[in-house]
């Protein structure tokens, strides 16, 4: 009887191991081409017993919540008046921006990402609402804190991407994902959906790749033909056939920080 129970338990463990994570359910996207295809010993001495009342102690207050990142130095909106100070504040908050004092596309895209995270109008301009929010902003909380030291998190609701390296937030990018609508292009029809779930970077192409549905720059594929890639147009709302568009200003260096096998969480 004991032997039978032991074999039954062993069989159950084996079944659980064989049916665990690591496979995708449902139809494969391998043949689908998008537009973006396109974490001391010693002696003892007896001493007289004395009673001393315990000293009162006060527990230190908890540190402010910063999403697991170091707290930023306090600034005022007036401190962010110059383009370079504005860019430096965005960079300190891990938005992907070039700190050069130029209000270029890199700065605009970083501002859009900040506006998306904070529920502000997505203008890409340093309006008073933006500088007021930047002055007191903190790093966001992780979506998947146990997802691995190096990982990509994609927030479909807010249309932003987070890159973590060595357990710390490294970059925040604005993205544009699948519209969720039906499309037909040159006889190919489908639903423009960016799949939710847990994936990994499977393969990549360096430089431009031209597909039936458009062009992709430095695509990194994580689900069949669905990729993270650079594109000249990254609207502030979903606009792709399913891929995750990132700004060209980020797409040049982003792949070097995301090796093949990196976990990708789409939520």
Name each model feature, range by range.
Residues 1-25:
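Secretory targeting and sorting signals
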Residues 21, 26-31, 53-58, 141-149, ...:
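Exported/periplasmic cell-wall-interacting domains
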Residues 42-66:
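Extracellular mucin-like PTS domains
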Residues 62-77, 128-151:
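Intrinsically disordered, low-complexity Ser/Thr-rich linker and spacer segments
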Residues 74-83, 88-109, 113-133:
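Short acidic, glycine/serine/threonine-rich helix-capping segments at coil-helix boundaries
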Residues 83-87, 108, 112, 131, ...:
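Extracytoplasmic/secreted envelope proteins and their assembly/folding machinery
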Residues 88-95, 112-120, 135-139, 166, ...:
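Sec-exported extracytoplasmic/periplasmic mature domains
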Residues 140-180:
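A structural motif detector for short, solvent-exposed N-terminal "entry" segments of globular domains
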């Amino acid at each position: 009887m004991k032997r039978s129970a032991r074999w039954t338990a062993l069989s159950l463990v084996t079944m659980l191991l064989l049916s665990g994570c690591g496979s995708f359910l449902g139809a494969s996207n391998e043949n689908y081409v998008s537009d973006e295809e396109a974490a001391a010993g010693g002696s003892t001495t007896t001493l007289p017993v004395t009673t001393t009342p315990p000293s009162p102690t006060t527990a230190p207050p908890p540190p402010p919540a910063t999403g697991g990142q170091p707290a930023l130095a306090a600034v005022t909106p007036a401190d962010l008046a110059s383009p370079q100070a504005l860019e430096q504040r965005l960079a300190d908050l891990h938005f992907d921006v070039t700190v050069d004092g130029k209000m270029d596309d890199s700065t605009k895209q970083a501002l859009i990402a900040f506006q998306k995270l904070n529920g502000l109008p997505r203008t890409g301009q340093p309006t008073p609402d933006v500088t007021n929010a930047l002055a007191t902003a903190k790093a966001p909380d992780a979506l998947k804190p146990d997802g691995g030291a190096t990982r990509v998190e994609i927030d479909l609701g807010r249309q932003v991407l987070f890159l973590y390296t060595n357990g710390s937030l490294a970059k925040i990018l604005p993205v544009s994902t699948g519209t969720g609508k039906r499309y037909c292009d040159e006889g190919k029809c489908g639903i423009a959906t960016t799949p939710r779930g847990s994936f990994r970077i499977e393969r990549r192409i360096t430089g431009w790749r031209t597909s039936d549905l458009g062009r992709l720059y430095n695509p990194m594929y994580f689900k069949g033909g669905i990729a993270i890639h650079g594109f000249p147009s990254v609207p502030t709302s979903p606009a792709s056939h399913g891929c995750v568009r990132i700004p060209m200003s980020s797409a040049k260096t982003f792949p070097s920080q995301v090796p093949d096998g990196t976990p990708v969480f789409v939520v």
